[in-house]
Amino acid sequence: MNLILLGAPGAGKGTQAEVISQALSIPQISTGNMLREAVRTGTEYGVKAKAAMDSGALVSDDIVIGILKERIAQDDCKNGFILDGFPRSVPQAEALDEMGVKIDKVLEIFVPDETIKQRVSGRRVCEGCGATYHIQFKPSKVEGVCDKCGAKTIIRKDEDRKSVV
């Protein structure tokens, strides 16, 4: 089964995708995690994405689509997947069609603006492995330190206070 989860940043797409992924035994494909992994491993697309990510800008559709094509071609996606954060634009949606990807269900998560602000302003991400935390709802065991790899947790560059407000 191929699913898409839509919603504003902080709506809970990643949280819900994780639950569904475990229940259906299909991978959660997060655009953000894919991009961070491509940057970390220094792939061709990762090198291209790094400059945009470092400045807090959105990565171009061509780069995101290229990374997604590579990801859904992997063996663990043969029985389905959950797209979390993709598509974000008409060209990205058209790319799914052009790839011949059949989407079985699209779920959109609606959350009030005030809740979104509260969720996003408390989010933290590990500099090392990309694990996500929230200072109120899902804190790390030691404040500012990733439970998984021990690296520092930070506010994502695309979620600084100005972009939240």
What residues fall within each predicted segment?
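Glycine-rich phosphate-binding loop of ATP-dependent small-molecule kinases
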Residues: 1-165
